[in-house]
């Protein structure tokens, strides 16, 4: 590979490697059949939309069983296979962990700057009654899917501005022509949140209706009950295989995958304990010891949450939060170290957002930060009161805060934050909301002055862009600084990853110091599964919040399950 490939060297976009086989390092032969019942990372939240053009963050999680993408995670690099990858990051695939999915190979070229992608031949869209006849997946499907996203009125601001055009040069070749180097090219459409390849026939039938959904993936969506379950059934004509030992096996192994939507925490924990769930992907630390005692056979994985927790303070409207002294004061008023020790019982990191510690050179630990950043994480109510008085609020003030009732951790944590703030004269009026209304408040910019949430890190560049660049959807504070925006754009265009890492570290320091959020600790989360779940090691994502390729490679040892009394 030449041109951009050479220029990018170790950058994410340039180190997309040729497809490599998925090799599971186990001597146990797989078994077909059975169903897999899962409480996913988002067990409390039902599917939000089946249409990628809605630009809904959870779309990939729910459709990634049947809409495949150009690229995906190379699961042969998983730790359980002797590799280095945990595959829990919400939307960050290191360059060495990417493989072709619908793409067979690709090559960067110059003049104009472009990437030519050769697609796998013979992959089929299955027949869907009332929607489409069975037919081959071709390059025009990629072009159609991209163009539809690019023209969507719900498109994230600037999402595809780096792309000049996308065209099919023959039946199995698609060419992306870029305006300039761009660090996230592969993520934005190759394996990102809205990157699934959708046939035109589904759009013509109505892409928002789950009954019309069909794709090239290992499963097909066969039932959906909002607030209850998503059911995916094995696609018998699926093209991919899993290599185990010296033999290749057709996947998927299970006949059915079911996502269970369970809003009550005690209920989904009980469902795991009693074997009604085979896997529960997100368990708060409070429930771990009791589960280990009552169900000692469970297997476990612990991971640092892939989203930062914070109280966003709106700076895009008149009020106390316009003054940086107020924002800094509220940070100093909250005893964050005590929250780690007492509330989380040590199961959290004081500092792990907006960059994630798993991002290597993009992450800078707190002890390396400037003193002005470090003091935001040190409890100093006296200093907080002084700053509030200097800003004109010697007696404090009050404000409303919206929080999602879907998040048990937040429902417990926010009153604790409120108690700290009350000690410096700042009172919160807490407004719990169901997830749909909570999300709508942010996307419509109708939220209150305070907005308590967690936001996915996503990847080292997007974690800054989506939260702090002007006009971005996931920017709850309304932060806007043209100079900051320009620095972010420069980072995206920088082809040298070492230089880009330094630029992102600078951007992270700057936004931490200006404190549009009350920065809070990041908890550890646990995943658990029963021993009859095979070819699995706690992996959560094979792309942007997309678990489909992981589930397709799991099998259920039904004999063992029966032997264990389930």
What are the residue ranges of the model-derived segments?
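Extracellular/periplasmic solute-recognition and catalytic clefts
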Residues: 165-166, 222-233, 260-318, 337, ...
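Aromatic- and charge-enriched surface segment that lines or borders ligand/interaction sites
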Residues: 97, 102-153, 259, 268-271, ...
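Detector for C-terminal structural segments
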Residues: 40, 44-46, 55-65, 225-230, ...
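Alpha-helical secondary-structure segments
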Residues: 37-40, 134, 138-143, 171-175, ...
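Gly/Pro-rich hinge or "lid" segments in bacterial periplasmic/extracellular proteins
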Residues: 74-79, 85-93, 97, 187-258, ...
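Surface-exposed binding/hinge segments that line
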Residues: 31, 107, 111, 116-121, ...
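Ligand-site clamp/hinge motif
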Residues: 135, 204-210, 238-290, 306, ...
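N-terminal lobe/hinge region of extracytoplasmic solute-binding protein
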Residues: 37-110, 214
């Amino acid at each position: 590979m030449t041109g951009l490939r050479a220029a990018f060297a170790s950058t994410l976009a340039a180190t997309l490697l040729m497809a490599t086989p998925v090799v599971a390092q186990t001597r146990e032969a797989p078994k077909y059949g059975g169903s897999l019942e899962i409480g996913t990372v988002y067990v409390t939240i039902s599917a939000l939309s089946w249409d990628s053009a809605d630009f809904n963050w959870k779309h990939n999680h729910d459709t990634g069983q049947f809409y495949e993408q150009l690229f995906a995670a190379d699961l042969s690099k998983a730790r359980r296979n002797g590799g280095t990858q945990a595959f829990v990051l919400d939307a960050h695939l290191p360059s060495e962990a990417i493989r072709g999915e619908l793409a067979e190979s690709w090559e960067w070229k110059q003049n104009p700057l472009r990437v030519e992608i050769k697609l796998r031949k013979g992959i089929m869209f299955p027949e869907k009654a009332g929607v489409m006849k069975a037919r081959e997946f071709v390059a025009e499907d990629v072009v159609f899917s991209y163009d539809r996203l690019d023209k969507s009125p719900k498109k994230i601001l600037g999402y595809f501005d780096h792309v000049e055009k996308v065209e099919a040069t023959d039946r199995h070749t698609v060419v992306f022509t870029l305006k300039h180097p761009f660090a996230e090219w592969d993520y934005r459409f190759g394996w990102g949140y809205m990157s699934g390849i959708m046939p035109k026939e589904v759009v013509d039938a109505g892409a928002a209706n789950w009954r019309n959904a069909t794709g090239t993936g290992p499963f097909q969506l066969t039932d959906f009950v909002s607030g209850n379950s998503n059911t995916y059934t094995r696609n018998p004509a699926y093209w991919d295989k899993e290599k185990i030992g010296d033999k290749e096996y057709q996947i998927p192994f299970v006949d059915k995958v079911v996502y269970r939507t369970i809003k009550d925490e005690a209920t989904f924990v009980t469902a795991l304990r009693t074997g009604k769930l085979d896997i529960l992907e997100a368990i708060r630390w409070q429930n771990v010891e009791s589960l280990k005692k009552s169900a000692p056979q469970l297997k476990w994985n612990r991971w640092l949450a892939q989203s930062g927790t914070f109280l966003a303070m709106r700076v895009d409207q008149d009020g106390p939060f316009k003054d940086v002294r107020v924002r800094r004061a509220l940070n100093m008023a909250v005893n964050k170290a005590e929250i780690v020790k007492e509330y989380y019982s040590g199961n959290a990191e004081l500092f792990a957002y907006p960059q994630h510690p798993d991002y290597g050179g993009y992450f800078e630990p707190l002890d390396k930060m400037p003193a002005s950043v470090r003091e935001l994480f040190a409890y100093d109510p006296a200093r907080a009161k002084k700053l509030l008085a200097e800003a004109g609020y010697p007696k404090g003030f009050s404000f409303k805060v919206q929080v999602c009732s879907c998040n048990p951790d937040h429902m417990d944590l926010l009153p604790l934050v409120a108690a700290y703030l009350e000690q410096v004269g700042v009172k919160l009026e807490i407004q719990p909301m169901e997830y749909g209304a909570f999300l709508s408040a942010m996307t419509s910019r109708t939220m209150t002055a305070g907005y308590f949430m967690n936001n996915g890190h996503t990847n080292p560049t997007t974690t800054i862009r989506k939260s702090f660049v002007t006009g971005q959807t996931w920017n709850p504070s309304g932060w806007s600084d043209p100079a900051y925006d320009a620095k972010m754009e420069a980072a995206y265009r920088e082809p040298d990853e070492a230089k880009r890492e330094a630029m992102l570290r600078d951007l992270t320091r700057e936004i931490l110091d200006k404190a549009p959020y009350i920065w809070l600790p990041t908890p550890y989360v646990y995943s658990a599964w029963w021993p009859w779940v095979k070819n699995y090691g706690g992996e959560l994502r094979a792309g942007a919040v997309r678990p489909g390729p992981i589930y397709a490679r799991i099998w259920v040892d039904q004999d063992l399950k029966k032997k264990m009394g389930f």
